[in-house]
């Protein structure tokens, strides 16, 4: 993502309020299995194939999400 500014997030588990900021900022980040408080982050490539998925409640969800966004997360224009 040369020439882009990364929007990084907390390295701790994510809260519901942070979900909106992430899916608003990145065009290939989606929410899956959303029954309320617990959900999964999904990053898809340009062809729609899943590149990565994790639960928001995992201890290092934010750390791994930031790493994946650095390589696979184009910002919305």
Curated annotation (Swiss-Prot):
Q: Which Pfam families match?
A: DUF905
Q: Which Gene3D superfamilies match?
A: ykff protein like domains
Note the superkingdom of the native organism. Answer: Bacteria
Q: Which InterPro entries match?
A: DUF905, YkfF-like_sf
Name the protein family. Answer: Belongs to the UPF0401 family.
Name this protein carries in UniProt: UPF0401 protein c0279
């Amino acid at each position: 993502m040369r020439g882009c500014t990364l929007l990084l997030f907390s390295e701790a588990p994510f809260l519901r309020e942070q979900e909106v900021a992430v899916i608003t900022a990145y065009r290939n980040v989606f929410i899956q299995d959303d029954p309320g408080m617990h959900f999964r982050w999904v990053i898809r490539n340009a062809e729609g194939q899943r590149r990565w998925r994790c639960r928001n409640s995992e201890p290092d969800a934010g750390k791994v999400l930031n790493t994946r966004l650095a390589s696979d997360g184009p910002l919305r224009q």
